[in-house]
């Protein structure tokens, strides 16, 4: 299955949540797309579990294999599996670039990383799924810093909305200060439903 690049509004309406940010389409039509979208049937527990997994995959832009690998990695580690899964998702390089305010969306963050605009601890990293650790420094290449289009876009965004990240606007670098706690992750994801789905 390829990564979804279709209409964002359609996905937001499917989950009845602004998956990719504020959605005017969702405000106008807060029901699923399709001929029978307005008819809301009571979902089974399994359907809810699938929906929560699908929502998380769309939010973070992962394919099934990538998502499953992160889940099993979290399941093997000591701790609360659902929270560990969210931590793995949050500390992906593309997500941190987005959280720092370097880009307006995760999709554009993924492109910035893939096109070798981002550094980690001074070295170029072009793998969006790169797992960051506490203490890692995220920055822009010198060539990217000289691009007015990118630097103006960065300066127009508000930064440091996340307690677990730090942003230095003068040096244009960010730092992972700690792993995010569940209450610091704003997305409305029922991670326990995902755990139950994979545990069957």
UniProtKB/Swiss-Prot annotation:
Provide the GO biological process annotations. ribosomal small subunit biogenesis; translation
Function, as annotated, reads: One of the primary rRNA binding proteins, it binds directly to 16S rRNA where it nucleates assembly of the body of the 30S subunit.
Q: Does the keyword rRNA-binding apply?
A: yes
- Where does the record place the S4 RNA-binding domain? 91-150
For this protein, the record's PROSITE patterns field holds: RIBOSOMAL_S4, S4
The UniProt keyword set, sorted, is: Ribonucleoprotein, Ribosomal protein, RNA-binding, rRNA-binding
Please report the name of this protein according to its UniProt entry.
Answer: Small ribosomal subunit protein uS4
| GO CC term (a single one) | small ribosomal subunit
Q: So what family is this one in?
A: Belongs to the universal ribosomal protein uS4 family.
**Gene3D superfamilies per UniProt:** Ribosomal Protein S4 Delta 41, Chain A, domain 1, RNA-binding S4 domain
Q: How does it assemble?
A: Part of the 30S ribosomal subunit. Contacts protein S5. The interaction surface between S4 and S5 is involved in control of translational fidelity.
Q: Which InterPro entries match?
A: Ribosomal_uS4 (IPR022801), Ribosomal_uS4_bac-type (IPR005709), Ribosomal_uS4_CS (IPR018079), Ribosomal_uS4_N (IPR001912), S4_RNA-bd (IPR002942), S4_RNA-bd_sf (IPR036986)
The terms under GO molecular function for this entry are: rRNA binding; structural constituent of ribosome
- Pfam families referenced in this protein's UniProt entry, alphabetically: Ribosomal_S4, S4
